[in-house]
């Protein structure tokens, strides 16, 4: 079996859940499977993460930390790397160039699933940085929140990272989802932290696609082949 290297810590709870999802998926194939997994927890400060998520600032410092993690995973024996953070994929090309092993792309894996499902209008729930850098705009017809709601999503994601006001944030996020879902035939949780608030598979009759689950599925498949 191959070894996967996870660039984690963005945020820690999401990384832990992603890790367990990979194990669960591998054990569905074979109950005795215990996949080989390395995790490099990115030592990023909340201040730097918030600055990048909200304002796309601090790119140089953020990229340096991600590249260090990628190189450490390669040195540790990883056969390929995954990053369970959509926003970090702003740097996917630089990360790929920094190592000599494959790096799975959460954006590409998600696009494959959405195209297979023939989703025509996809409601996008993501960080301001993901929206600003148009990570999902290629080949997907997106329905984006209005400016105010997008700012609220940024605040909600920061609160998730700080473990603050969880119940209140869920209610606020559901209101935003209700607005977006009226124009969508699919909803995309394009921030891996959002699944901590929205575990549902459908909301208002609209199917919810979780990018973290999609990447976990692609990771397990690669581990087992």
Q: How should these model regions be labeled?
A:
Residues 1-225:
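Non-catalytic structural scaffold of enzyme domains
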């Amino acid at each position: 079996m191959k070894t996967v290297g996870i660039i984690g810590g963005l945020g820690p709870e999401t990384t832990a859940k992603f890790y367990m999802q990979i194990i669960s998926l591998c054990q569905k194939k074979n109950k005795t499977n215990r996949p080989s997994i390395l995790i490099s927890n990115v030592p990023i400060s909340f201040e730097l993460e918030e600055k990048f998520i909200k304002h796309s600032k601090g790119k140089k410092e953020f990229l340096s930390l991600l590249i260090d993690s990628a190189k450490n995973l390669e040195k540790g024996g990883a056969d390929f790397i995954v990053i369970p953070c959509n926003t970090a994929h702003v740097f996917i090309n630089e990360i790929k160039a920094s190592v000599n092993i494959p790096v799975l792309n959460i954006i590409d894996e998600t696009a494959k699933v959405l195209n297979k499902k023939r989703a025509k209008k996809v409601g996008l729930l993501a960080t301001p940085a993901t929206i600003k850098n148009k990570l999902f705009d290629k080949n997907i017809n997106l329905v984006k929140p209005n400016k105010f709601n997008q700012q609220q999503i940024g605040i909600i994601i920061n609160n998730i990272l700080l473990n603050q006001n969880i119940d209140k944030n869920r209610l606020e996020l559901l209101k935003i989802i209700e607005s977006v879902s009226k124009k969508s035939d699919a909803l995309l949780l394009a921030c891996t932290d959002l699944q901590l608030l929205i575990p549902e598979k459908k909301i208002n009759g609209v199917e919810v696609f979780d990018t973290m689950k999609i990447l976990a599925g692609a990771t397990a498949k690669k581990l087992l082949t």
